[in-house]
Amino acid sequence: MAAKDVVFGDAARAKMVEGVNILANAVKVTLGPKGRNVVLERSFGGPTVTKDGVSVAKEIELKDKLQNMGAQMVKEVASKTSDNAGDGTTTATVLAQSIVREGMKFVAAGMNPMDLKRGIDKAVAAAVEELKKVSKPTTTSKEIAQVGAISANSDTSIGERIAEAMDKVGKEGVITVEDGKSLADELEVVEGMQFDRGYLSPYFINNPEKQVVQLDNPFVLLFDKKISNIRDLLPVLEQVAKAGRPLLIVAEDVEGEALATLVVNNIRGILKTAAVKAPGFGDRRKAMLEDIAILTGGTVIAEEIGLTLEKAGLNDLGQAKRIEIGKENTIIIDGAGDAAAIEGRVKQIRAQIEEATSDYDREKLQERVAKLAGGVAVIKVGAATEVEMKEKKARVEDALHATRAAVEEGIVPGGGVALLRARAAISALTGENADQNAGIKIVLRAMEEPLRQIVLNAGEEASVVVAKVIEGKGNYGYNAASGEYGDLVEMGVLDPTKVTRTALQNAASVASLMLTTDCAVAESPKEESAPAMPGGMGGMGGMEGMM
């Protein structure tokens, strides 16, 4: 085991604060509408240009072990805020730096770090309650566009694209971001339920131009096993043929004699059918079949519940207005399912999302909700170069997270004003002793910091602007993009409540840990010995005789 350096007290804290400052100073230049870019070196290819705080934080690794510890703790603030709220990483970093900086002064003056922490926690709890009080729900598409634009560094076109996508697929719908093929941003919307399984045979295609199978007003048969024997299918096929409507079969697989018979009937025009494999695997496949059943008003034919394929009737089949099947995807549009049953299923899946432990499970469950509740929208990001594409795509993803957060918990005035107004709830607080009061003061000072940094990045005098905003009331603040004072909500400068709240809570949590640190243990730097002198070159002995 390698030897360790153990550093105590002020010496340990001072080094860690240096690391905090290095990382925070690199991140905070990106804050606000006039924030600057940071250029990140890549091991191959061109550098990446970004205004995303968490992207900058993730790149920073310091040589000094103790400094690096401080930097990594603040990096944790940024990444945790990004994970929870999807945005607000720079604000969280600025708040953490301020709490650490102010707190260290009090610790150096001999105050009790644990009491300081208690004071900080008390102040943050009061501020969070105040933020929840002033928060108002997002009701209009315009507000969603404004939140998206602010998060995308005042790019209104990105905000409008996201608002348009949310209008199309609903607030529960899935919105994904992909690389576009042109210079302009594009929005593609898939209505209804889409799953990633295509036709089992190209002979089902009835629209050669688009190379897809189109079924109008079809029945949908859902079966959770393989179908290879046509005898099992015959009774239900005869009933569908009498009804004179097309049929989609969704099963684990359709093969052999069964598939061949379906294809022959299709070619001869006796019965219009198509077959696709069921989406997902294992338990997820069963759940998705059940989703399709609820969406189409049908029943999954499963032996577990005593249903067999040969006994299936028309009342077991689902129905839809239209189904389109491509080589890789199937889209069910306007299923005949009962609205109350669909709503119940969505609630059930949401409860599973709350309990899900892995991000992958949560994402898959969220997709299922979207497929039942709305649809899928794809924002294709257009740009002239790959570097610009990456930077813009990161901003679109940030804006998307911010709008989701705004829908979830509502909005507050942006530009650092919400935190500044929440100070009113803190200034009335008193701790149990002088040290706790000092902790409350630390948070009071820190909550001015985001506005100060926004103003500094805009090239204005921070103290003057902060003093003027404090004099105002409610939504009155400074719009750094235009250099004007006024009602920020009317100007469209909005922040999601969840982002502001999460940034403050995470910053205080990590900063408090740092203030209460009294010892740091790091691996000692290895002393590399100088390389040995190379040996003499052989065969040079006879050189003297040549002189």
Curated annotation (Swiss-Prot):
It catalyses: ATP + H2O + a folded polypeptide = ADP + phosphate + an unfolded polypeptide. It is an enzyme of class 5 (isomerase). GO terms for cellular component: cytoplasm. CDD domains: GroEL. ATP binds at residues 30-33, 51, 87-91, 415, 479-481, 495. Its main location: cytoplasm. Pfam families: Cpn60_TCP1 (PF00118). One of its GO terms (biological process) is protein refolding. Keywords: ATP-binding, Chaperone, Cytoplasm, Isomerase, Nucleotide-binding. It is found in: Cytoplasm. Its EC number is 5.6.1.7. GO terms for molecular function: ATP binding; ATP-dependent protein folding chaperone; isomerase activity; unfolded protein binding. PROSITE patterns: CHAPERONINS_CPN60. NCBIfam families: GroEL (TIGR02348), PRK00013.1 (NF000592), PRK12849.1 (NF009487), PRK12850.1 (NF009488), PRK12851.1 (NF009489). Belongs to the chaperonin (HSP60) family. HAMAP family: CH60 (MF_00600). Forms a cylinder of 14 subunits composed of two heptameric rings stacked back-to-back. Interacts with the co-chaperonin GroES. Together with its co-chaperonin GroES, plays an essential role in assisting protein folding. The GroEL-GroES system forms a nano-cage that allows encapsulation of the non-native substrate proteins and provides a physical environment optimized to promote and accelerate protein folding. This is Chaperonin GroEL. It comes from Cupriavidus necator (strain ATCC 17699 / DSM 428 / KCTC 22496 / NCIMB 10442 / H16 / Stanier 337). The lineage of its organism: Bacteria, Pseudomonadati, Pseudomonadota, Betaproteobacteria, Burkholderiales.
